[in-house]
Amino acid sequence: MNSNTPTDIVSFCFETQADHNATGPILIDGLTPTRSLTLHQFRQLVCQLIAGLHEQKIQQGQCILVHLENSILYPALFLAIVGVGAVYMGAHPASSATELEHLLSLANPSLIITGRDTLSTVLQCTMSPSGGKKEKIPSDRVWVLNDIDQVLCEAFSSTPDASMGDAAYHHRRDITKLLHSGQRPWRTFDDDGQKSKITPAAMFATSGTSGLPKAAILSHHALIQQHISIHHPVPYPVTRLLTLPLFHRYGALVALFFPTRYAQPLILLPGFQLRPFLSAIHVHGVTETYLSPAMVHILIQSTPQSSSIRESLRSLRYVCVGGAPIDSRPLQSLQDMLHPEACVAQAWGMTETATVFQDRYCLPSRQFDKGSVGVVLPGYQVRLVDVSGSGRVLDNATEIPGELQVRGSGLFTSYKGHPDHTDGDGWFSTGDVMYQKNGHYFLVGRMKEMIKVRGYQVSPVELEAELAQHPLVKDAAVIGVLATDGSSELPRAYVVPLSWAERPSPEDIYDFMRQRLAGYKFLEGGVVFVDSIPRNSGGKIRRTKLSELDDQRDKLIALLT
């Protein structure tokens, strides 16, 4: 990091690196484009929220949990929380009470900000289970975002209505009340950067695909370094569209830094739906967006020959795909739908590491194997270690799979309550198996998820990629199940048909896979048709959940036979 670079997140965001029209919007509501914020308005809103949180006696290092869907207010809340000296943590607004209770136990927040439609779930978690008067979290520490337009009106009105706030939801606090304390500057660091490295800024919940989520703590320094790693100048004006959740680490990085630091407009949607997504790209001339593999499949299955869809996507120049494994073939299909100068590429990262690999924008003549998750980004070191457990480092090995280990300035500090996460030299074991070829890295799968078939290691990711090529398959997931004689694991596929009326038979699926894979990779565990595959908000398959459903299915079959 340059010695003149600000070391706290808020200063870093507002250290604008571009000449721009200060009256132009930097954050735009994709569903209601007239709802937007300029850089000046955004900065004012952040300082107002900091003043309001300060009035609530928020102490340095306390956690504030944000339980909201994407909106143009979300980045302001994040920066205000960090700016007052607190620690941000986000929660999925669709979390069940059980899931939210787990996050509350991790975060131990001093204040919760939720929405009108999600307040009831929060109250289930914060009220005493006995129905008594004692609350787990006092009612005056649960604040509600009732109406975005009301917040914007209050923030920028010359005569804000100080009677607002307590009136909404009776004794629940409306966050407009936070806007009635004037403005207050954010906390900065007055040393050479050491405080930035040890001061927590945010906690992000890990994916929870193989167990309960943990809270990964990230410092100011780590988040700034993560942004520096992914920032890359491009030869076109950048307007971004984001449908990924802002409570997710990658969504937060995109929404926080790019609009403020580089005056690059960001259009926000609450989630991915095809029609609003295409409309936002077309209306705003979006040049960059970020997709999960599930979103890619929706796009390429939605009449890819349609001229109207192709026209809607024509302004795109860079599409970054990540969050879960994907094969090169659907990426190439998406590439073929875009402008000749567009680039579709993968990225790989974790909550704990941020984005470590990425293929950045380049012209088609210089493009790469789309099956790769990319090259190592600046600020990181990586190595592959023998998966047998010997600890042997696979130095410069080509196409030999090994467990990925990472170190660098963008790594998380620790899991909350679990300080030890790296070895003595700072290497973090990711649990992902990869191989490298010509400096590009390729994902094989998770070590825990590899299926051991009669001595062979079978990657469910590989089988899922082949299943996705079947013309009658919409989605699929593969897990290992124990053979009836207990001698081996066998691959079992859960398949979502493109149409139940024309679904393939299990035999069709078996034959399709036999023609494409080695014998030990056959779906000897069976094929099960389902309505949907359980995935997390980033698109990753929740294999623990799928295994639980599989166990229930086997028990039911045993009862009926």
From Swiss-Prot:
One GO term (biological process): secondary metabolic process
Record's catalysed reaction(s): acetate + ATP + CoA = acetyl-CoA + ADP + phosphate; propanoate + ATP + CoA = propanoyl-CoA + AMP + diphosphate
Cellular component aspect of the GO annotation: membrane
Highest taxon, organism lineage: Eukaryota
Record localization: Membrane
Glycosylation site positions: N21, N396
Keyword Ribonucleoprotein: no
GO MF terms held by the record: acetate-CoA ligase (ADP-forming) activity; ATP binding; propionate-CoA ligase activity
Pathway per the UniProt entry: Secondary metabolite biosynthesis
Region of interest (AMP-binding), residue spans: 462-540
InterPro entries referenced in this protein's UniProt entry, alphabetically: AMP-bd_C (IPR025110), AMP-bd_C_sf (IPR045851), AMP-binding_CS (IPR020845), AMP-dep_synth/lig_dom (IPR000873), ANL_N_sf (IPR042099)
Membrane topology according to the record: Single-pass membrane protein
Record key words, sorted: ATP-binding, Glycoprotein, Ligase, Membrane, Nucleotide-binding, Transmembrane, Transmembrane helix
Purpose: Acyl-CoA ligase; part of the gene cluster that mediates the biosynthesis of 2,4'-dihydroxy-3'-methoxypropiophenone. The first step of the pathway is the conversion of acetate into acetyl-CoA by the acyl-CoA ligase ppsA. Acetyl-CoA is then used as a starter unit by the polyketide synthase ppsB and condensed with 4 malonyl-CoA unit to produce the pentaketide backbone. During polyketide extension, the polykedite chain is probably reduced and dehydrated by the KR and PT domains, respectively.
Annotated protein name in UniProt: Acyl-CoA ligase ppsA
Organism: Aspergillus oryzae (strain ATCC 42149 / RIB 40)
